[in-house]
Amino acid sequence: MKTSSFKRRPYFAASAVFFAAVFAGQLLSCAATSPAAKTVDPAKAVTELAPVTRLAAKPSEGVYYSLFVRSFADSNGDGIGDFNGITAKLDYLNDGNDLTTSDLGITGIWLLPIFPSPSYHGYDVDDYYNVNPDYGTMEDFENMLAECKKRGISVIIDMTCNHSSTYNDWFKASRDPNDPHHDWYRWAKEGDARYNLKQQMWGHDLWNEDFKNKGYYYAGLFGKHMPEFNLDNKELRAEFKKVMKFWFDKGVSGFRYDAAGHVYNRAELAAGEESASKAVAWWKEIIDYNKSVYPDQYSLGEVWENNAVRAQYVAGLGSCFHFDIGDKYIADELKYNDAGKNTYANMLESDLGRYARSNPDYIDAPFLSNHDQPRVGGVLRGDTAKLKTAAAMYLLSEGVPFIYYGEELGMKSGTKDETKRTPMLWNTSNSAGKPKDKMQTTWAAASDCIYNKKTLSVAEQEKDPSSLLEYYKRLIRVKTAHPALFKGRLHAIDTGAAGISSWAMVCDTERAFVMHNLSKEAVTFSVPADYADLAAVFVSGTDVAVNGSQITIPSLGTVVLAGN
């Protein structure tokens, strides 16, 4: 960016002094509370990776990192990631010091399942009051939480209230029709006309006959190894509240509720039984309970449905993952370098409007890809420029964004689930094929790791100021330094320029205007008058230019303006 040109553009900044004032947060009422504001030079952060004063502090603010423990970092050499490995690598995620730029800068971690389980992924839970011994001890987990707290990192854990494993003691007891636990799960007796015991789900039987008690069938929406809970049972509901309290007492900040849209799946209910309304009521009950235990808690649900259905669940959960943002909205526009008629921003505004009508206090949770989806690095064919723009489009939108581990490196996958969950790439291998980083996990099959043979590791990307990793660091810093970006509401604003995707973010102390050029060519246009008084706080590169009353953004470039 030609910095001198901003002096010719009064509505960007009248002078370098005004630049510094806005960037240091002197125009933001909440910025003065941070002691780091006196030692950070925010003007540098506009065009390069530099320290900022990070203001996002609550569990419901900032940027989360979705982390599969098994694949992240191995502290004991058994090839499997563990809690001590995470602790050792925390400084990569956030070292707790605003004055450094070596860390990613995230403010929260979502740990994929940590409970004992017969499966590598952990979504069929044996014991809700313990940790997977593959990952370490409860003491190791508590130590990891303590180290996260020192760095200002909130931790939420995956919680499955929809089903358990068949090895869970609750399910074992439930197999006796006379045991009180029998009603904790969805059982049906042969001949009960209310249920279709021949029902198929995703290519398998929904109802599974108990080999010990012929004529009794239990529901397994995701397979016979995952028996479904019956949340109509009051004792089970009370037990789950005890589970939440147990983990809050350990120090977690909330939960990611797996399969939240399936707890009352219509396929497994008796004919005529209510589905969505009962599910929403359950989630409201559990979220209200969580808040009674920890008022600042942040929990959210996985509702992998269309936006209209998801909006219903927002009424109870308060926050849901925003499916479709990455694999449909962003990826499609970047594949074809076509912003349409500001399509992405308009679709977001429409989706978020549904949430607001359902729950005025909703918190959106955008993401590019997750552990169940092909990685965005592969979807966009490893195109670093497009991956940078994809990151900017969701990290700078409304809500609490979730980065899937390795996404900041451009990791790729196939369609098989195991390929989406392969080891984090800390360093390249030596001549003998062994990882140079001793904490590199090695549990995954070599055939599942082939997609990342050419993906650059953390060690390699940290040496390159233009790498995807370093760009993520910049984006996260601008997100967490500006209240409009981490707690503002999104408003689609059309510049009238073809190829430009743009929106405003507004909170009570600040406004921001976000612009991306999705086309293949540079685009010159005027910033809308309502945002013409704002100063630049982020530009993607030096080739952004201002000429008189117009701004020019190169292909796949991003500019963010902010001020009060």
What are the functions of these language-model segments?
Residues 3-17:
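Bacterial N-terminal signal peptides that target proteins for export
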Residues 522-541:
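Beta-strand-rich binding/interaction modules
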